[in-house]
């Protein structure tokens, strides 16, 4: 059996909000496997559903740039939050995002190899910045959204500077209406995405493995009710339908009023402007999402430096 360390218990508590003894028991029952322990706690009703696994721990900035019918989103990581406030780092994020937009880049390796505005490549400028700022930095990911007609709108939450912050969102609206008409709706929808964190545009687009995991948890919880099999099946189907509804953008309740599905908000906006509007897609980057940052033992570092 794997050793159940205090660090494992702490991580499980941080990710689930469950009590210490419950976390210890979950880890013991699942041989120290964090993900299996989360599912075990949820089947016992001791932990809330986690939309995405993994601690969010990396620093840096997410930047966006749009030009009407196109938008680019880029994440650049650093070791500390302090670098995210550095003007040179912010200028790099701004330039790299513009490069991604101008060149239509969707691949991080292609972005690294792209020409940088002041000369050389993006990767070479990044290397120069690392030497100047004195802290490791990396290009993490890039995304591009386009529409044939309409608008792609961007939004950042917790902005450190114009167009860059901790959470970045792009929303694509297809319509014959002008970009200036669509901009207010796009901004509100992007703010909704930042807050509600949908996992897909439609319920049917949700990741199959994620839905299967939710179904397994729902089946275990429903089985514990002791109800007849046909009732248990309906309970499971209801739980999955609720999961799809709450995690798909078009069926989520609009955060601005808390009662209207996003699909209805878009349809109503189309009637208001006299042109059909289709929400074609969205991209949401949360800084450090899915990256586990190694925690250092400061006392041990000092001791090592002193040769103790």
UniProtKB/Swiss-Prot annotation:
Gene3D superfamilies: 1.10.286.20, DNA helicase RuvA subunit, C-terminal domain (1.10.8.10), Elongation factor Ts, dimerisation domain (3.30.479.20). GO terms for molecular function: translation elongation factor activity. GO terms for cellular component: cytoplasm. It comes from the Bacteria. Residues 80-83 are annotated as: Involved in Mg(2+) ion dislocation from EF-Tu. The keyword Transmembrane does not apply. The keyword Hydrolase does not apply. Associates with the EF-Tu.GDP complex and induces the exchange of GDP to GTP. It remains bound to the aminoacyl-tRNA.EF-Tu.GTP complex up to the GTP hydrolysis stage on the ribosome. This is Elongation factor Ts. It comes from Sphingopyxis alaskensis (strain DSM 13593 / LMG 18877 / RB2256). The lineage of its organism: Bacteria, Pseudomonadati, Pseudomonadota, Alphaproteobacteria, Sphingomonadales.
């Amino acid at each position: 059996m794997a050793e159940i360390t205090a660090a494992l218990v702490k991580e499980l508590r941080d990710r689930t909000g469950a009590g210490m003894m419950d976390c210890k028991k979950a880890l013991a029952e699942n041989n120290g496997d964090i993900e299996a322990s989360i599912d075990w706690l949820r089947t016992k009703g001791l932990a809330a559903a986690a939309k995405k696994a993994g601690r969010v721990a990396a620093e840096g900035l997410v930047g966006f740039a749009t030009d009407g019918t196109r938008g680019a989103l880029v994440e650049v990581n650093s070791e500390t939050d302090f670098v995210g406030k550095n003007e040179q780092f912010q200028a790099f994020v701004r330039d790299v995002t513009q490069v991604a937009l101008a060149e239509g880049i969707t691949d991080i390796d292609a972005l690294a190899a792209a020409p940088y505005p002041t000369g050389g490549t993006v990767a070479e400028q990044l290397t120069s910045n690392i030497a100047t700022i004195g802290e490791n930095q990396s290009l993490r990911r890039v995304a591009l959204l386009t529409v044939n007609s309409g608008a792609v709108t961007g939004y950042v939450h917790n902005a450190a500077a114009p167009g860059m912050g901790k959470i970045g969102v792009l929303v694509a609206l297809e319509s014959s209406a002008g970009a200036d008409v669509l901009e207010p709706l796009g901004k509100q929808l992007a703010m909704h995405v930042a807050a509600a964190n949908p996992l897909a545009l439609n319920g049917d687009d949700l990741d199959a493995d994620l839905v299967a995991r939710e179904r397994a948890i729902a089946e275990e919880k429903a089985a514990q009710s002791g109800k007849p099999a046909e009732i248990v099946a309906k309970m499971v189907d209801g739980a999955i339908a609720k999961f799809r509804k709450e995690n798909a953008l078009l069926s989520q309740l609009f955060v601005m009023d808390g009662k209207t599905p996003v699909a209805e908000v878009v349809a109503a906006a189309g009637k208001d402007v006299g042109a059909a509007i289709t929400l074609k897609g969205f991209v949401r980057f949360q800084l450090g999402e899915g990256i586990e940052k190694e925690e250092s033992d400061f006392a041990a570092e000092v001791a090592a430096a002193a040769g103790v």
